[in-house]
Curated annotation (Swiss-Prot):
Gene that encodes it: acyP
InterPro entries, per database record: Acylphosphatase, Acylphosphatase-like_dom, Acylphosphatase-like_dom_sf, Acylphosphatase_CS
Enzyme class of the recorded protein, top EC level: hydrolase
Pfam families hit by this protein: Acylphosphatase (PF00708)
Molecular functions per Gene Ontology: acylphosphatase activity
Keyword Ribonucleoprotein in annotation: no
Protein name: Acylphosphatase
Residue ranges of coiled coil: none
Keywords: Hydrolase
Origin superkingdom: Bacteria
Family, per entry: Belongs to the acylphosphatase family.
Catalytic reaction(s) noted: an acyl phosphate + H2O = a carboxylate + phosphate + H(+)
PANTHER family: ACYLPHOSPHATASE
Residue ranges of domain Acylphosphatase-like in the record: 7-92
Length: 92
């Protein structure tokens, strides 16, 4: 039996750098069993790659709209990703 994996890349804009957004995203991802990464982009956004069971990836995507308490999320744009699924969730 093969488990279906979803891979999604999201870019989050707003006040999302310098507010522990990446670390909080990693905590949520690990809790949900999602692998991938969260990294700052030069333009002030954060990019998240989420790989895992579709329901877990959907929960993480939903959480990205709120983020940690210090963040102010203005928009979240997600699209399917073709990246290989990482073994863990990292912050870069």
């Amino acid at each position: 039996m093969t488990t279906t994996q979803e891979k999604t890349r999201c870019t989050i804009s707003g006040r999302v750098q310098g507010v522990c957004f990446r670390a909080a995203t990693q905590e949520q991802a690990v809790r949900l069993g999602v692998t991938g990464y969260a990294r700052n982009l030069r333009d002030g956004r954060v990019e998240v790659l989420a790989c895992g069971p579709p329901e877990a990836v959907a929960q993480l995507r939903e959480w990205l709209h709120e983020g940690p308490p210090a963040a102010t999320v203005e928009s979240v744009a997600c699209e399917p990703a073709d990246d290989p699924a990482p073994a863990e969730f990292s912050v870069g």
